[in-house]
Amino acid sequence: VHLTGEEKSAVTTLWGKVNVEEVGGEALGRLLVVYPWTQRFFESFGDLSSPDAVMGNPKVKAHGKKVLGAFSDGLAHLDNLKGTFAQLSELHCNKLHVDPENFRLLGNVLVCVLAHHFGKEFTPQVQAAYQKVVAGVANALAHKYH
């Protein structure tokens, strides 16, 4: 991902304020509610029968935290996203058979959640930088599919 110094600063400054557990759970939960076909990858998570069940599900929250932990690792290695996400790409491609389009959807949901949590602080410039990052991460996660 090519980010200007200003964009990198905007991304890392905001990320330093992110509650990974809260934002991760909300982002994954929203993905499962807004795009219900993604729930098929999480059948072992128990009750996903309603939006309230999804958003309150402890396994969704825990996995969301794990997902954002990996995203944090990516932010520390923006110049080598493919390398950083190589193992996760292989896992999601070969073992889990996740449609790579879901990575793009989750990235966009994450941007929405960040905007919701940070309001005016999530300026159009910050959003533009995050859109580049989530697109880069989605591309890196889809790498083993090509």
UniProtKB/Swiss-Prot annotation:
GO MF annotations, alphabetized: haptoglobin binding; heme binding; hemoglobin alpha binding; metal ion binding; organic acid binding; oxygen binding; oxygen carrier activity; peroxidase activity
CDD domains: Hb-beta-like
UniProt modified residues of type N-acetylvaline: 1
Modified residues (N6-acetyllysine): 59, 82, 144
Keyword Transmembrane: no
GO biological process, one term: hydrogen peroxide catabolic process
The keyword Transmembrane appears for this protein: no
Modification type Phosphothreonine: residues: 12
Residues found modified as S-nitrosocysteine: 93
Similarity-based family: Belongs to the globin family.
Protein name listed in UniProt: Hemoglobin subunit beta
Originating species: Leontocebus fuscicollis
Lineage of producing organism: Eukaryota, Metazoa, Chordata, Craniata, Vertebrata
Gene: HBB
